[in-house]
């Protein structure tokens, strides 16, 4: 099939999106944005800020020694896409059950950035539950809040809170901004957590995940040719041993590349973008939807001939393989 209808486009600009909440895809692990792709051009690298504790925030028995009180150290946290500082909160009250049964209270940072205690439903026995919103279990906390600790009591008699009553296991009792670990997928405009986020907020939803990002805008590269996607190659090496051979395989990711005729080789737009990480979109037939997406750092090698227009040989150094798209 002839490639005379082929077209190569490059990322010539972006559509920016300010810090806003991402949407849970439904599995509590993949969060979608409003963009199809995430740019990584200069000044446009995605910034992802899941709600959660960053530094400080230790919850300890009140230094005053007063019954039913805890102290919360000053802290920083991601809150609605902003890094917030929260002042120390001393002598914060914990409400015990009215009888000698188990009760769990969550120490939280509200959406307004202040400390608040959210009490769970009292048990009917001295047994605690790990199920949210159950009798004797931790509460579902408000959407937009951050849980930093739980305080567990099993008696109704006023007494100092002890260290043994305070629970701060990350992922169970404490929501951190850096847990679970996440990766950003520029080729799908999504954020992926390595484990599903706990559904501990009202309505059975996860903590909120915020991000700012930019979606690439594409422009056709005129007079381009010889596009090569970034693809993985495989090789085999062998070692001779007694009675036979042991083989091992290895893989490597090759550079993408293309060539183009230039106007003057100096003011051409593609030359102005050299050394940036850009998206490139290749259509084998510009009248059809299938295309190849490649994101990588643009390298250029210019040739200035005596009688011809300047030419450029471009490389695309990618972190991942090019992606084949049907539409």
Regions from the PLM with identified roles:
Residues 105-108, 259-295:
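Short, acidic/charged, Gly/Pro-enriched secondary-structure junctions
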Residues 93-101, 199-200, 245-250, 269-272, ...:
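Exposed beta-sheet edge/beta-hairpin loop segments within beta-rich domains
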Residues 207-259, 295-309:
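Solvent-exposed edge beta-strands and adjacent loop segments
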Residues 281-326:
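Short beta-strand and beta-hairpin "edge-sheet" elements
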Residues 110, 261-263, 317-321:
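Solvent-exposed residues in well-ordered beta-strands and their adjoining turns
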Residues 106, 150, 255-259, 279, ...:
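Beta-strand secondary-structure signal
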Residues 73-79, 101-108, 243-266:
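Beta-rich globular "head" domains
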Residues 3-215:
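Beta-strand-rich solenoidal segments
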């Amino acid at each position: 099939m002839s490639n005379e209808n082929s077209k190569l486009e490059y990322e010539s600009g972006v559509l920016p999106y300010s810090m806003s909440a991402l949407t849970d895809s439904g599995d509590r692990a993949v969060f979608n944005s409003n963009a199809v792709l995430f740019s990584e051009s200069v000044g446009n690298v995605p910034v992802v800020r899941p709600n959660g504790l960053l530094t400080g925030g230790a919850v300890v028995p009140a230094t005053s020694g007063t019954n039913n009180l805890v102290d919360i150290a000053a802290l920083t946290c991601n809150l609605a896409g902003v890094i917030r500082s929260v002042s120390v909160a001393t002598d914060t009250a914990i409400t015990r059950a009215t009888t000698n049964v188990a009760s769990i209270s969550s120490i939280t940072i509200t959406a307004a950035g202040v400390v608040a205690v959210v009490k769970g439903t009292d048990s009917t026995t001295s047994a605690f539950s790990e199920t949210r919103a159950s009798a004797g279990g931790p509460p579902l906390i408000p959407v937009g809040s951050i849980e930093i600790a739980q305080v567990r009591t099993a008696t109704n008699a006023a007494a100092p809170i002890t260290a043994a009553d305070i629970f701060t296991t990350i992922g169970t009792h404490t929501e951190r901004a850096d847990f679970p670990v996440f990766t950003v997928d520029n080729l799908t405009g999504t954020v992926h957590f390595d484990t599903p986020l706990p559904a501990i907020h009202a309505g059975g939803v996860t903590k909120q995940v915020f991000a700012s990002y930019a979606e690439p805008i594409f422009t056709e590269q005129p007079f381009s040719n010889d596009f090569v996607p970034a693809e993985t190659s495989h090789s085999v090496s062998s070692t001779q041993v007694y009675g036979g051979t042991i083989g091992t395989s290895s893989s490597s990711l090759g550079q993408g590349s293309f060539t183009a005729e230039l106007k003057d080789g100096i003011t051409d737009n593609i030359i102005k973008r050299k050394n940036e990480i850009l998206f490139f979109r290749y259509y084998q037939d510009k009248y059809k939807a299938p295309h190849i997406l490649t994101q990588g750092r643009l390298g250029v090698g210019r040739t200035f001939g005596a009688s011809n227009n300047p030419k450029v040989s471009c490389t695309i150094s990618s972190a991942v393989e090019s992606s084949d798209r049907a539409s």
